[in-house]
């Protein structure tokens, strides 16, 4: 969820900018502050200009790709985050100054941007072959998280003595989002950026049905991992969809690619800046000559 949180981080402020008028924002013994005054002050700040950029990009993305992102898709991704973080989900939202509604708004914004990337990224067979070299199918594992190494070692001893992994996960794991599922987590591959790198490295070494024989130290504590499903790689033609997804996901993390895509989207969006003080707000994407021609 971290990428989503940083993606369109100023979305909440956007509503403030959109609601300008002569209404009073605050009153003091020295006088009142109106929305117009607030806007005039805010628009000249870096954060204010960033908000306007994001609002414009969101508007044109919604117009061009809105029909490709359903409410169901947004809800599905939202629920995956909720399941992933379990009981800590609300506190994570709160610490990032977000609500359920604002998170869903950001998820939609990111999905719209991904649709733009997909539409503008022509993937060749050579691209697929290159991606295939490092491709490994998603694996499914179960894990037991504890705070002490000695506890993890005791769990491994119980497994060696024939203990049931699912029962041990429910008994010992401190991960509230997975313990009642026997420690099972969503399938992942090497491109997953939310899992600890030590966790992934240890997991990929396991054969199906095997578990780690020593505790795995991660940023969360100590983990015992069991491989549940490890599909064979198979043929490239069987994984075209997954390969394209990997390429698109990589592009979503590449600033040069995103800048190029957003530039194309904005040019197609017929954007006109009406406020002369903000005429250069899109220079990052359209260049000074394009922005200065707006009225």
Curated annotation (Swiss-Prot):
What protein name does the entry list? Foldase protein PrsA
Where is it localised?
A: Cell membrane
Q: Which NCBIfam families match?
A: PRK04405.1
Lipid-bearing positions (S-diacylglycerol cysteine)? 20
> Which species is the source of this protein?
Pediococcus pentosaceus (strain ATCC 25745 / CCUG 21536 / LMG 10740 / 183-1w)
Gene it is expressed from: prsA
UniProt entry keywords in alphabetical sequence: Cell membrane, Isomerase, Lipoprotein, Membrane, Palmitate, Rotamase, Signal
Q: What is its EC number?
A: 5.2.1.8
Q: Does the keyword Lipoprotein apply?
A: yes
MF annotations from Gene Ontology: peptidyl-prolyl cis-trans isomerase activity
The answer, when asked if Signal is one of the entry's keywords, is yes
Family the entry assigns:
Belongs to the PrsA family.
Signal sequence span per UniProt? 1-19
What is this enzyme's catalytic activity, as reactions? Answer: [protein]-peptidylproline (omega=180) = [protein]-peptidylproline (omega=0)
Tell me which PROSITE patterns the record gives: PPIC_PPIASE_2 (PS50198), PROKAR_LIPOPROTEIN (PS51257)
Offer a single GO CC term for the protein.
plasma membrane
Q: Its topology with respect to the membrane?
A: Lipid-anchor
Positions with an attached lipid (N-palmitoyl cysteine) read 20
Listed InterPro entries: Foldase_PrsA, PPIase_dom_sf, PPIase_PpiC, PrsA_foldase, Trigger_fact/SurA_dom_sf
Indicate the segments forming the PpiC domain, all copies.
136-229
The processes (GO biological process) annotated in the record are: protein folding
What biological function has been recorded for the protein in this entry? Answer: Plays a major role in protein secretion by helping the post-translocational extracellular folding of several secreted proteins.
